[in-house]
Curated annotation (Swiss-Prot):
This is Small ribosomal subunit protein uS11y. Keywords: Cytoplasm, Phosphoprotein, Ribonucleoprotein, Ribosomal protein. The keyword Repeat does not apply. One of its GO terms (cellular component) is cytosolic small ribosomal subunit. Its main location: cytoplasm. The gene is RPS14B. GO terms for biological process: translation.
């Protein structure tokens, strides 16, 4: 009988982020979509093709009514910042979005607190841009001819 060859386990070094020099910033793009029902915080690479982290306010709280709250957005943003630090991202460009279209163009209550939580957690903020879709000639808004009657 021949002796069985044992394979030595290969040691792989896993680098989550890009290799950078000391003091150099690694940028990601954080897309904050704040509606009045939920707040989405979605981090991609600079091209926007590769999703790195995506967390919503609804993933952080139990009650449905609290999904869009500033508290849920703050918890989600802290989670996102921690995950980004693990991946090696140190700075972010922010793209803030409201519902837009023929609906409301003002961001929901979680937008400001999410942005503040990202900044307070040690992330450097690059550009802040509003990417709410604004129609040039909109479709008709819901509510009918006489509007919503309260």
């Amino acid at each position: 009988m021949s002796k069985r060859k044992t394979k030595e386990p290969k040691v792989e070094t896993v680098t989550l982020g890009p290799s950078v020099r000391e003091g150099e910033q690694v940028f990601g793009v954080v897309h904050i979509f704040a509606s009045f029902n939920d707040t989405f915080i979605h981090v991609t690479d600079l091209s926007g093709r590769e999703t790195l982290v995506r967390i919503t306010g609804g993933m952080k709280v139990k009650a449905d009514r609290d999904e869009s709250s500033p508290y849920a957005a703050m918890l989600a943003a802290q989670d996102v910042a921690q995950r980004c630090k693990e991946l090696g991202i140190t700075a972010m460009h922010v793209k803030l979005r409201a519902t837009g279209g023929n609906k409301t163009k003002t961001p929901g209550p979680g937008a400001q607190s999410a942005l503040r939580a990202l900044a307070r957690s040690g992330m450097k903020i690059g550009r802040i841009e509003d990417v709410t879709p604004i129609p040039t000639d909109s479709t008709r808004r819901k509510g009918g001819r006489r509007g919503r009657r309260l």
